[in-house]
Amino acid sequence: DIQMTQSTSSLSASLGDRVTISCRASQDISNYLNWYQQKPDGTVKLLIYYTSRLHSGVPSRFSGSGSGTDYSLTISNLEQEDIATYFCQQGYMLPRTFGGGTKLEIKR
């Protein structure tokens, strides 16, 4: 199986900040990389697919980039509603494995 690693398990930022979350695959996944958002209430939403394509209804402050084994999700101008845990997932090969998640919190 392809292993997905999110080296940062939690991240603190202030509202209005630009935040970048990284993800690394154990092999080249040819841009088949998705990002999901899990809210504190458990609601899960697809944000980005195929590295950089925004899912319908997702605000443009979210963006994705990367290639090969290294990928990132960037949130520009962080808003309160963005507080959540973010997971990367590779869609290159079955099983479609996930990273361990990065929990985004407000800096106090």
Curated annotation (Swiss-Prot):
Q: Where is this region: Framework-2?
A: 35-49
Pfam families in UniProt: V-set
Signal peptide positions (record): none
Taken from the UniProt record, the cysteine pairs bridged by disulfide bonds within this chain are: C23-C88
Q: Which keywords does this Swiss-Prot/TrEMBL entry list?
A: Adaptive immunity, Disulfide bond, Immunity, Immunoglobulin
Q: Where is this region: Complementarity-determining-1?
A: 24-34
User: Where are the stretches annotated Framework-1?
Assistant: 1-23
Respond yes or no to whether keyword Disulfide bond is given for this record. Answer: yes
Q: Where is this region: Complementarity-determining-3?
A: 89-97
Disulfide bond: is it a keyword of this entry? yes
Where is region (Complementarity-determining-2) located?
A: 50-56
This protein's GO cellular component annotations are: immunoglobulin complex
Source organism superkingdom = Eukaryota
Query: Region (Framework-4) spans which residues?
Result: 98-108
InterPro entries (UniProt xref): Ig-like_dom, Ig-like_dom_sf, Ig-like_fold, Ig_sub, Ig_V-set, IgV_Light_Chain
List this protein's GO terms for biological process: adaptive immune response; immune response
Q: Where is this region: Framework-3?
A: 57-88
Task: Please tell me what else the database record remarks about this protein.
Answer: Anti-arsonate hybridoma protein.
In Swiss-Prot or TrEMBL terms, this protein is called Ig kappa chain V-V region HP 123E6
* Natural source organism: Mus musculus (Mouse)
